[in-house]
UniProtKB/Swiss-Prot annotation:
InterPro entries: Cyt_P450 (IPR001128), Cyt_P450_CS (IPR017972), Cyt_P450_E_grp-I (IPR002401), Cyt_P450_sf (IPR036396). Its main location: endoplasmic reticulum. This is Steroid 17-alpha-hydroxylase/17,20 lyase. Keywords: Endoplasmic reticulum, Heme, Iron, Lipid metabolism, Lyase, Membrane, Metal-binding, Microsome, Monooxygenase, Oxidoreductase, Steroidogenesis. GO terms for biological process: glucocorticoid biosynthetic process; hormone biosynthetic process; progesterone metabolic process; steroid metabolic process. Regulated predominantly by intracellular cAMP levels. The 17,20-lyase activity is stimulated by cytochrome b5, which acts as an allosteric effector increasing the Vmax of the lyase activity. Substrate binds at residue 202. It comes from Macaca fascicularis (Crab-eating macaque). It catalyses: a C21-steroid + reduced [NADPH--hemoprotein reductase] + O2 = a 17alpha-hydroxy-C21-steroid + oxidized [NADPH--hemoprotein reductase] + H2O + H(+); progesterone + reduced [NADPH--hemoprotein reductase] + O2 = 17alpha-hydroxyprogesterone + oxidized [NADPH--hemoprotein reductase] + H2O + H(+); pregnenolone + reduced [NADPH--hemoprotein reductase] + O2 = 17alpha-hydroxypregnenolone + oxidized [NADPH--hemoprotein reductase] + H2O + H(+); 17alpha-hydroxyprogesterone + reduced [NADPH--hemoprotein reductase] + O2 = androst-4-ene-3,17-dione + acetate + oxidized [NADPH--hemoprotein reductase] + H2O + 2 H(+). A cytochrome P450 monooxygenase involved in corticoid and androgen biosynthesis. Catalyzes 17-alpha hydroxylation of C21 steroids, which is common for both pathways. A second oxidative step, required only for androgen synthesis, involves an acyl-carbon cleavage. The 17-alpha hydroxy intermediates, as part of adrenal glucocorticoids biosynthesis pathway, are precursors of cortisol. It comes from the Eukaryota.
Amino acid sequence: MWELVALLLLTLAYLFWPKRRCPGAKYPKSLLSLPLVGSLPFLPRHGHMHNNFFKLQKKYGPIYSVRMGTKTTVIVGHHQLAKEVLIKKGKDFSGRPQVTTLDILSNNRKGIAFADYGAHWQLHRRLAMATFALFKDGDQKLEKIICQEISTLCDMLATHNGQTIDISFPVFVAITNVISLICFNISYKNGDPELKIVHNYNEGIIDSLGKESLVDLFPWLKVFPNKTLEKLKRHVKTRNDLLTKIFENYKEKFHSDSITNMLDVLMQAKMNSDNGNAGPDQDSELLSDNHILTTIGDIFGAGVETTTSVVKWIVAFLLHNPQVKKKLYEEIDQNVGFSRTPTISDRNRLLLLEATIREVLRIRPVAPMLIPHKANVDSSIGEFAVDKGTHVIINLWALHHNEKEWHQPDQFMPERFLNPAGTQLISPSLSYLPFGAGPRSCIGEILARQELFLIMAWLLQRFDLEVPDDGQLPSLEGNPKVVFLIDSFKVKIKVRQAWREAQAEGST
């Protein structure tokens, strides 16, 4: 009996022990690992994973590998190596690993964010990029859409003058409407039941993905009851049902001679493909309703929670750093005033604000670890071999907190992005990739940067953002899920006296 058990264990150890494709090649240093469970017993059990991986660099260097279950994962924590993965060898490493929870979220690896490299991903990314080109000029100009929603946001916040509130939901509404207008040309009024549905499923999905699930490391575990997995499936179904409803209603009013949003772009591509008017890379099978809905879901999901979270981080850091906030008020008062609202062109004048946004994206990156990549071919990173199928994680936290690259990296210092005179924005380090880079870079970077700048410029022009009367400051610890979230906090909103006086003068 025991001999049989021992034989079975030896067989499993042989089957699951990592095998090198190139026996003579030099591979990254590796944590200890065991058959089946890999390096899991040897990883730190407390603290955030991105920080734990960063600490391991002191022992293993800026590139090392771990066995996550039965899969080899290479951790990259230096900007030169990261750029080799993302840019120089971007095609080699543009794949996505197959992960149980992400398969559910992406309707079995459709869409853009979690789809593997291939014709489908290339097509949908290209069509999404084409959508953003629609919003460069005219009535559909991106800036105009953003400012319309920010104006509504400011009007709503003004009704809470002198009150202490959580700004999460109001900011969520504004950003959701911007994305919704880009995706299918509709916006929601505050109190719309669909808006609550979007908010609830969004929170549910992020919460589910934030729980480190063993089923992602051991997919065979999905045959057993799993509350987190069931919760994720439930919220994804709610999302899919809502998007399907919007899609079906939209089909009735679609006109191929009026392309104004992402759904139009995708539907036109599908129609052209069905009619044989598309190129060879535009297979109609890759433009099924399910493919289209997943791509819309990707843009809708990724574009909302990320920007909402960064806005809250900015406000939180300003509450902790009143001297920076004071300088921002002075900068806006001197360069914009109160006779007009801020515009994107003010970026050249509101340098400290732009530097503040950049610093927040450094010190609290949207994703401390980028979505895992996968090697499509046998390749290398630096001097080390990387086998086909290897998972690669860029530890953005390590890049943004490297003491050799950043002076006092754990300190909030917007001035690091300005020259000594404060008259010019600078790039103090190459170790800065807040939106990733290369083929898998964030396609919504331009949108996100515009939203962050305009939202903060408008808020600071109109409102004093103050610590609540109870003195409770936001926690800056954060909660890294699929997005680096900040714990809920409240801020005291007061309409600025200078703004009120300017408005009173303008109305007389």
